[in-house]
Amino acid sequence: MAALTVIGVGSRLRGDDAIGPLLIDALSDQTHSQIELVDAGSDALGIIEYFQGRDHVIVVDACQMGRDAGCIEEIDPTQIDLVIKDDPVSLHGLGLAEAIKMAESLQMFPEDLKIIGIEPESIQFNGSLSVPVQRALKKAVKIVHTELNRVKQLAEA
């Protein structure tokens, strides 16, 4: 099994919301046998199945955090209280926060779970990332590689 699982969440049809799946695309261009890549699309709840049996997981999604577009926040779900929002127009069905809470209640958390949230500029129906989120995509790829190196060092220790 791969040392690290990276799960991208988001709709490719909603501008910057596509950041998760597009990160998976970018990483698949740099094929690495120690990274398992999962494009979860807009099914945030479906990520729970990829938590089982994995020790190190990163989830990447567009997150409206009130920051500048393209801002990247590494979120440790055990250190913050994820707020569950009632969003009647969410394309994710149940959102990422709900999926995290459900995994926690089902005791299906991986040993090491990180969430990378990227502030979107626009999640309107269009086909392209905004310039700030394009820049964030490149940074997020580097974050994943840094995390893989950390996981490999842990395995060697």
Language-model-derived ranges and their functions:
Residues M1-I118, G127-K139, H145-A157:
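N-terminal catalytic or cofactor-binding beta/alpha core of small enzyme domains
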Residues P120-S122:
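Short, internal active-site loops enriched in acidic
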